[in-house]
Amino acid sequence: MAERVSLTLNGTLLSPPPTTTTTTMSSSLRSTTAASLLLRSSSSSSRSTLTLSASSSLSFVRSLVSSPRLSSSSSLSQKKYRIASVNRSFNSTTAATKSSSSDPDQLKNAREDIKELLSTKFCHPILVRLGWHDAGTYNKNIKEWPQRGGANGSLRFDIELKHAANAGLVNALNLIKDIKEKYSGISYADLFQLASATAIEEAGGPKIPMKYGRVDASGPEDCPEEGRLPDAGPPSPATHLREVFYRMGLDDKDIVALSGAHTLGRSRPERSGWGKPETKYTKEGPGAPGGQSWTPEWLKFDNSYFKEIKEKRDEDLLVLPTDAAIFEDSSFKVYAEKYAADQDAFFKDYAVAHAKLSNLGAEFNPPEGIVI
């Protein structure tokens, strides 16, 4: 049985440091720089949980790392603790309020830093997934913000990060931690979506018509309940996809176009329960080896996802039940066939769908957003 790793950080945000700190770990955290699976597995797997009871202050966390008392009593190595403290820094920073907005110049500069990160870490898939999973919790039937979910930066809080669908996304927070610290005038919600759109573009995909100015959810109490993101292998894949994406206000064309982003990345069985440990396409780099990809060139954004599913010629390529559904359902198939034959049409529809997804549930300040 594959082992899934998740983080649980117990403590009240922005409270004084407690007198003791207890750290336990039942499995080592494995950091990887290139991974993706938009859809979570419905199959069960064992989970390793790391728990911390500590202040949410970033400065306090840093002091803990160098504390002799912690060093002598902790069962974790310094390297493993640093991974946990990265997530802690995302939880502890004071969130933006409705009176704040991301700084346009900082957004532009952060975009350049993200491009540099992508060129050295090959982390396009996991950054795409980060933006999607923050936005994909939106429920159009709930009017109140931030209870309605969506692109509000709530994925930085441990209560949401430990959802099964978000397994491995602590690695995405690790990757962009320094950028967030460098550009404090950018909301988490904006940074997640900026990273996602930039990753698509830098992988050769279309330019996404993005806007910024998203306001951050203020605390873990604003996180949505678990279960709003799609499964990979539900009993009725087409019905399940519609239930999830219609709840967001998206339609069949959006569903198929967004599915095409699986042209990037790999599924890792230790996270999702799906895919092979490695294939001829993933046994070597770039990035950490392993997993099973949907396409041979899994860091290139193109329409090969649709071509490969249609042809079904390579057993080393992954096809999830929800992937197969886009060619089995009569309405989905219209778009899937179109995108397999016409990459320009796919790029056009994908750019619109991605921008739509990135805005779901967001509270913008100014209301019209910021274009950079």
Curated annotation (Swiss-Prot):
UniProt cross-references to Pfam families, sorted A to Z: peroxidase
Keywords: Calcium, Chloroplast, Heme, Hydrogen peroxide, Iron, Metal-binding, Mitochondrion, Oxidoreductase, Peroxidase, Plastid, Potassium, Transit peptide
Enzyme kind, highest EC tier: oxidoreductase
Disordered: region residues: 1-28, 217-237, 261-294
Keyword Iron: yes
Disulfide bonds: none
Protein name: L-ascorbate peroxidase S, chloroplastic/mitochondrial
Source organism (scientific name): Arabidopsis thaliana
UniProt transit peptide range: 1-91
One of the record's GO cellular component terms: chloroplast stroma
Something else known: Binds one cation per subunit; probably K(+), but might also be Ca(2+).
Catalytic center residues: H133
SUPFAM superfamilies, per the entry: Heme-dependent peroxidases
Any one GO biological process: cellular response to oxidative stress
